[in-house]
């Protein structure tokens, strides 16, 4: 099933690129929480929803662009968790650092994940405890790697005081910044060793990247040391967390 989901992410990426390259208008509007949404978000959402309903008609889908109410979700044990365009701010800035995120959740755990970066044409995927990166038609297994000093990857759009204080106390390290779920993927492929997050995220922002990072050997825990959990709950918000090889 992983190959079909990867193809679905590519199809969604193609829909996004039609807007990104100007073939179709961007049509930026603000949602209720003041976050931006574009025609590309909606186009990718439609592609993925249609594809998953065909692929697994009995498995419900939670997408950022049309999340079902709590009364619908509360008893879900297995479901798809989708962010059709993760990094909308990066998309609007046209820096290429945005992704299509698709994850399969089973009893609170992301057991399959796909993160596709359309501009870079790079696909990260994970299933059955293994993670892969596909680039230029070549697919290879990836895993975490230690480095000294460690490289810490941080958000390009969400710096905050807590993060600055954490980095000051961390000891010797280097930092790099990148948008969207690519932060999880840098840890997964051994380029970075730590991704700390204090600012707000939603479950669809993290599930696919979580699957990839965990399958590559990283730990994805909240600041109390518990694994991020995707068991349905009323709020879509995650606690703060860190993705680490340590």
From Swiss-Prot:
Its cofactor is Mg(2+). GO terms for molecular function: 3'(2'),5'-bisphosphate nucleotidase activity; magnesium ion binding. Disruption phenotype: Mutants require cysteine or sulfite to grow under aerobic conditions. Substrate binds at residues 64, 85-88, 205. CDD domains: CysQ. PROSITE patterns: IMP_1, IMP_2. Its EC number is 3.1.3.7. Coiled coil: none annotated. InterPro entries: CysQ, CysQ/Inositol_MonoPase, Inositol_monoP_metal-BS, Inositol_monophosphatase-like, Inositol_monophosphatase_CS. Converts adenosine-3',5'-bisphosphate (PAP) to AMP. May also convert adenosine 3'-phosphate 5'-phosphosulfate (PAPS) to adenosine 5'-phosphosulfate (APS). Has 10000-fold lower activity towards inositol 1,4-bisphosphate (Ins(1,4)P2). This is 3'(2'),5'-bisphosphate nucleotidase CysQ. It comes from Escherichia coli (strain K12).
